[in-house]
Amino acid sequence: MAELTISSDEIRSAIENYTASYSPEASREEVGVVTDTSDGIAHVSGLPSAMANELLEFPGGILGVALNLDATEIGAVILGDYENIQEGQEVKRTGDVLSVPVGDAFLGRVINPLGQPIDGLGEIASDETRALELQAASVLERQPVEEPLQTGIKAIDAMTPIGRGQRQLVIGDRKTGKTAVCIDAILNQKANWETGDEKQQVRCIYVAIGQKGSTIAGVKAALEEQGAMEYTTIVAAPASDSAGFKWLAPYTGSAIGQHWMYQGKHVLVVFDDLTKQAEAYRAISLLLRRPPGREAYPGDVFYLHSRLLERSAKLSDALGGGSLTALPIIETKANDVSAYIPTNVISITDGQVFLESDLFNKGVRPAINVGISVSRVGGAAQTKGMKKVSGSLRLELAQFRELEAFSAFASDLDAASKAQLERGARLVELLKQDQYSPIPVEDQIVSIYLAGEGVFDSVPVGDVRRFEAELLDELHRTASGVYESIKGGKALDADNAKALVEATDKFKETFLASDGSRVVNEAEAEALDAGEVGHEQINVKRTTVSK
């Protein structure tokens, strides 16, 4: 076997070369220590250079957000499984603020507030990220809200219209149909999506905060069944998640929407619901030992919602003309809209749709209280056709509610009041809709116009909805030209209005009420009986003709 020999000169040369190329480097890393932890909150000593809202890394790759920056310690919210965080563990700075991945790859997916998929469909490929805490668009970067966003719900589109870039609050007690109203608004965007025109398409984001997992799964199933998941993203922070996730979820949905808005696209975000986000933030603040205020909420709970909802905007044409429309949901107790969180959000938003439990229990669904529901954008967010036919609808319904309450105590009513009550009852019936069945704006315009013309006055109240459905089917066949002329919400001219009434009169001749009676407008002449004839005085004028 050959003997391996290395000369001393070779060894010396190798060492000299190594030492000549070596440059000593030193890195400085701040390390903190967990001093105590409970309920998703950790107090960390050290880390003197940490920034507000900076991401911190706990053992096992678990992240936290630095919220409290005290002189000697940091109060951090743990994002994820906090059960394994223990006293004495090391915590490191990341130097990053919280951000989420964004992009079209999120359409059709269900994610958590960190942007991670939780639907079992694999990873989401995205090269872009967006910080959760970003300044909202300034006044000069916006333009007035004038483009309608159709919800497909007659009562909303006619009386409390929503525009692209608006913030419209949906408020009411639990189990009054708040989520159903917002899901209908998402479903109604399907026709716009199928056009392929980005100026018409609306991408939707549904943010579920503190709901049961089964409820979120039900919403996803409803969207899939109607083919709406292809343009929708669900951000889920169910009740089983930590308070930190519930606090962050709305900001995640808003960040994803802002990314599309600044690309010149249109976005609809549903926050379901912000009451639970406020409760989660209250829990975080109390655990961080922040001083409590009214109803034990921290002093900055108004800022929690205002900085979120101010991101909704209709951008100027110079920035692409994109929009972000927000439908925040707030849950009340015993219809009390004067509580702390409801009044806060009412003052931030551009109007509210108030759903009343009494109306819901009476079968009026959607259970919208017309009296205190309002849109501060108003007719500017309506199409010309809808604006023309719905002008008096709110007033008629408000007068009907008032007269209805009065008639409960009045023993006798005049004919005009009775007619107003009859018309009002039919209008209420006409505005009822089944869940997950939005109505195109053309059908809404036709129905509301014909109701104003008194077409439904002769129809029994119980048959109004069946009459409307069959009438619209018939009009689509016999008056298709009228529908073409008002497509997209254009105004109804005199000739088309006359054609609608004539086609409706023909249909009424064939329609049978549930009791088998006809509903034609003309009152049939009744023959006088013998007694009435006997009491009549008949004057006969005789004329004499002289020869």
Swiss-Prot record:
CDD domains: ATP-synt_F1_alpha_C (cd18113), ATP-synt_F1_alpha_N (cd18116), F1-ATPase_alpha_CD (cd01132). Gene3D superfamilies: 2.40.30.20, ATP synthase alpha/beta chain, C-terminal domain (1.20.150.20), P-loop containing nucleotide triphosphate hydrolases (3.40.50.300). Coiled coil: none annotated. Pfam families: ATP-synt_ab, ATP-synt_ab_C, ATP-synt_ab_N. Its EC number is 7.1.2.2. The keyword Membrane applies. The record marks S373 as: Required for activity. It is a peripheral membrane protein. ATP binds at G172, D173, R174, K175, T176, G177, K178, T179. Keywords: ATP synthesis, ATP-binding, Cell membrane, CF(1), Hydrogen ion transport, Ion transport, Membrane, Nucleotide-binding, Translocase, Transport. It is an enzyme of class 7 (translocase). One of its GO terms (cellular component) is proton-transporting ATP synthase complex. It catalyses: ATP + H2O + 4 H(+)(in) = ADP + phosphate + 5 H(+)(out). GO terms for molecular function: ADP binding; ATP binding; proton-transporting ATP synthase activity, rotational mechanism. F-type ATPases have 2 components, CF(1) - the catalytic core - and CF(0) - the membrane proton channel. CF(1) has five subunits: alpha(3), beta(3), gamma(1), delta(1), epsilon(1). CF(0) has three main subunits: a(1), b(2) and c(9-12). The alpha and beta chains form an alternating ring which encloses part of the gamma chain. CF(1) is attached to CF(0) by a central stalk formed by the gamma and epsilon chains, while a peripheral stalk is formed by the delta and b chains. This is ATP synthase subunit alpha. It comes from Rhodococcus opacus (strain B4). The lineage of its organism: Bacteria, Bacillati, Actinomycetota, Actinomycetes, Mycobacteriales.
